[in-house]
C-alpha cells in the first residue's frame, strides 16, 4: 500500500523522529499493521463518527492517536 500524508501529519511524524523514538517506533508498527490487516489489528482500531466517516483511529499511547483512512491501495 502507498502512504499518503496530510502535511500536518507529516510534520508531526518528523517531529517524533527527533523527539521520541519510542512513539515513532509505535507509529511505524501501527502503519505496518494497517497495511497488513486493514481496519483490524493492534491499537484498538475504532471507526470515527460524524464528519469523519470513513476514517479510523488507533491508539499510539494513552494520549495520542493515529487517524487514517484506507482508499483503494492508499493509507
Residue ranges and their predicted role:
Residues 1-63, 70-75:
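Basic, Lys/Arg-enriched alpha-helical interface segments
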Amino acid at each position: 500500500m502507498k502512504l499518503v500524508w496530510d502535511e500536518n501529519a507529516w510534520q508531526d511524524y518528523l517531529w517524533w523522529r527527533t523527539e521520541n523514538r519510542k512513539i515513532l517506533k509505535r507509529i511505524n508498527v501501527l502503519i505496518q499493521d494497517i497495511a497488513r490487516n486493514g481496519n483490524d489489528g493492534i491499537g484498538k482500531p475504532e471507526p470515527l463518527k460524524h464528519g469523519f466517516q470513513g476514517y479510523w483511529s488507533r491508539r499510539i499511547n494513552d494520549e495520542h492517536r493515529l487517524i487514517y483512512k484506507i482508499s483503494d491501495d492508499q493509507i
